[in-house]
Curated annotation (Swiss-Prot):
Belongs to the AdoMet synthase family. This is S-adenosylmethionine synthase. It comes from Dictyostelium discoideum. It comes from the Eukaryota. GO terms for molecular function: ATP binding; metal ion binding; methionine adenosyltransferase activity.
Length: 384
């Protein structure tokens, strides 16, 4: 038996990069709400007093981009310049063009049946699942995400009146390894850095974070006298949001996925409609991995899929059960082939990916969420 430490982080909805993810997905949702067949590739950048959206959108929808952007920023809680950003006064720049006709003719133009729609680009995507938590997500990532969600909840409901929208969490867990099996033993270290108002003391911040956030989220069995806490360790975090750091869409792809576990193909999710396999392929890979682990076929599972632009059928499917599989990887690949149609149009149909449900995926994680709109989290009963 051996042991090791593993760490995952997360950020709140008010982090500059996460602002951008949410704005990009708010634009996507606004298009899909009027035209479910919208083709959207929307990036966002932000800095002090400014949000810029840029990209390629082909849609029948009539979208007020200024309104969509400001509403997304308002929802996060940036409603006063004292917080580092104000949805009412920020400058919104729009640089949106139509999707390239070269891409359109190769992917979807003239293709009536879902089975014929090609992938919007080449690339490889990964999905991961593990039985160490009920959500079949890694414990490090689960706890980092839940700390963020609790902190955000307490800020919005006024319990933490001193809290501001921008914050980060990080959790280190000690694992033991026996053969191929890994088991989380204890939480080694917790880091929380949260933006705050001018008046609150560090003593109150640290007490509130420990009592109201950490103890509400982390099961007592994982905390002990040796757990290390770094709570606002810099000593001051008044300047936050886009005033403190610039933000870009797609800069938090590991937080969006599995916190460093498994693997990542590099493509971001937010701002992309489901013909973009960076998103739909990654959702499908999670759907597969979670279904395999839920069926007891493995304790842990990594799935890779790859695509070529304009081609419907995936080029490859790969599975790794880390030595925990109850069947061979070849047998599991056959099960995948018999149960999942990974052509992009079929994924859009089976996972209902033309609905305007993506803004809420852009904060708190795309995976491991208990929400019926996250269809890729619904375990599929497998035909063996």
């Amino acid at each position: 038996m051996s042991s090791y430490l593993f760490t995952s982080e997360s950020v709140t909805e008010g982090h500059p990069d996460k602002i951008c993810d949410q704005v990009s997905d708010a634009v996507l949702d606004a298009c899909l709400a009027q035209d479910p067949l919208s083709k959207v590739a929307c990036e966002t950048a932000t800095k002090t007093g400014m949000v810029m959206i840029l990209g390629e959108i082909t849609t029948k929808a009539n979208v007020d981009y200024q309104k969509v952007v400001r509403e997304a920023v308002k929802k996060i809680g940036y409603d006063d310049s004292s917080k580092g950003f104000d949805y009412k006064t920020c400058n919104v720049l729009v640089a949106i063009e139509q999707q390239s006709p070269d891409i359109a003719q190769g992917v979807h133009i003239g293709k009536v049946n879902p089975e014929d729609i090609g992938a919007g680009d080449q690339g490889h995507m990964f999905g991961y699942a593990t039985n160490e938590t009920p959500t079949l997500m890694p414990l490090t990532h689960f706890l980092a995400s839940e700390l963020v969600n609790k902190l955000t909840e307490l800020r919005h409901n006024g319990t933490l009146a001193w809290a501001r929208p921008d914050a980060k969490t990080q959790v280190t867990v000690e694992y033991k390894k026996e053969g191929h099996k890994i088991t989380p033993v204890r939480v080694h270290t917790i880091v929380i850095s949260t933006q705050h108002d001018e008046k609150v003391t560090n003593e109150q911040i640290r007490a509130d974070l420990k009592e109201l956030v950490i103890k509400a989220v982390v099961p007592a069995q994982y905390l002990d006298d040796n757990t290390i806490y770094h709570l606002n360790p810099s000593g001051r975090f008044v300047i936050g949001g886009p005033m403190g750091d610039s933000g870009l869409t797609g800069r938090k792809i590991i937080i969006d996925s599995y916190g460093g576990w498994g693997a990542h193909g590099g493509g971001a999710f937010s701002g992309k409609d489901a013909t973009k396999v960076d998103r739909s392929g990654a959702y499908a890979a999670r759907w597969i991995a979670k279904s395999l682990v839920a069926a007891g076929l493995a304790d842990r599972c990594l799935v890779q899929v790859s695509y070529s632009i304009g081609v419907a059928k995936p080029l490859s499917v790969f599975v790794d059960t880390y030595g925990t599989g109850k069947k061979t990887d070849a047998e599991i690949l056959a099960i995948i082939d018999n149960n999942f149609d990974l052509r992009p149009g079929c994924l859009m149909r089976d996972l209902q990916l033309t609905r305007p449900i993506f803004q809420k995926t852009a904060s708190g994680g795309h995976f491991g969420r208990n929400d019926p709109d996250f269809t890729w989290e619904t375990v599929k009963e497998l035909k063996m």
